Amino acid sequence: MSNQEITVPKTIIAPSILAADFTRMEEALHSIKEWGAEWVHCDVMDGMFVPNITFGQKMIEDFRKKSDLFLDVHLMVQAPERYIDEFIANGADMITVHAEATTHLHRTILQVRNQGVKVGVAINPATPINAVEEVLGDIDMVLLMSCDPGFGGQPFIPYALEKSRRLRKMMGENQLDIEVDGGVSEENIDEILDSGINVIVAGSALFKAKDPKKTLEVLRYGTGR
């Protein structure tokens, strides 16, 4: 399939709640909706798979009570199958697990899908895309980490772009969402969109912006340069 024949799904903006002020989460959720974003990206870290701890199931439950936005829950945890059921029960709309974090990836995917929730698989910067090739028919999204996971505000690792191009070709007629997480900014959004990535996770770029609504539009459509 040539690049001309590939139809990339519509662009979705997923502000990362990790970049918000944790003492003002309800306000942050309201702001995200006001900016025009469709999703909220929720990074759950356990201090084992990644060197940081963020929040757990209770926070997702509280987000669900306060917002009707799509909750994109990214489990940066070892053996995510231990926690999936509770995150779903508490209101997650999508669960993304790391290919590197679970021994039986297909079984873990089915654990999510069998509960009627969307499922994604994430791969770290050094993990090749063939780690997800065999499960593309069972998932809704591939998340490409464009920084080493564990902390917000890190610089963008550009070879996520080539991974996206190769993934689009690998997907053929079944074009899934491809999400990018890490170092997204107005400076690199054009090349990100050009690579076929269509779900944009942005933390500092939005929460530290002077005009978040305007910045979100740039992240959605590019700079026009």
Regions found by a protein language model. Give the residues of each.
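Conserved N-terminal beta1-alpha1 strand-loop-helix module at the mouth
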Residues: 2-96, 100-104, 111, 117-119, ...
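A short, flexible beta-alpha/helix-coil linker loop
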Residues: 46-47, 147-151
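Short beta->alpha connector loops at strand-helix junctions that form conserved
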Residues: 98-99, 145-146, 203-204
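Short gly/ser/thr-rich secondary-structure transition/capping motifs
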Residues: 122-126
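Acidic, divalent-metal-coordinating active-site segment for phosphoryl/phosphodiester hydrolysis
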Residues: 183-195
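Acidic, Mg2+-coordinating phosphoryl-transfer loop and its flanking beta/alpha structural elements
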Residues: 197-202, 207-208
